[in-house]
Amino acid sequence: MIVWLNGTFGAGKTVTALRLRALVPGSRVFDPETVGYMLQPNLADHAVSDFQHWPPWRPLVAATAAELARYTGEHLIAPQTVLVHDYLEEIFTGLRMAGLTVFHVLLDAEDDVLRRRIHGSDEAREWRLAHLAGYRAARTWLIEAADLVVDIGVLTPDEVANRVACAVPGLGPG
């Protein structure tokens, strides 16, 4: 099982992943960005604005996740924004072909809530603000593609993690 936490930059995916891991025995956080960091020095001569645009990134994310799940026997929690529909489908298809069940969670909120959260954190503020428009453009299909949409606007990080844990079959008491 892989729980994929999607949403715009600054929506709380990483915090949710860490809280969810604490709630779910036999789970671990897998950060797909580490695959991008591995590719960066190897594809330095192939400039892209985001490593998700490198064609090898997507199948390597799926393969890495599948191998980690197979090796550890644990559920994976992946906090990763993916705003390109074809990219997400490519990754999820690879995960499913490797035998993993995918549960796609979208952490969502209105623009004013997201901007307030982003302004409240110095970490990557400009990057996060610059990508809000991309999230808004993808929001409709993301909502349709998600197994669970969580409005983070009025929930604490613990409440978000609890809601996810209860909604994912086989993870929580729900």
What are these regions (language model features)?
Residues 96-118, 150:
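Conserved phosphate-donor/acceptor-positioning beta-strand/loop module used by diverse small-molecule
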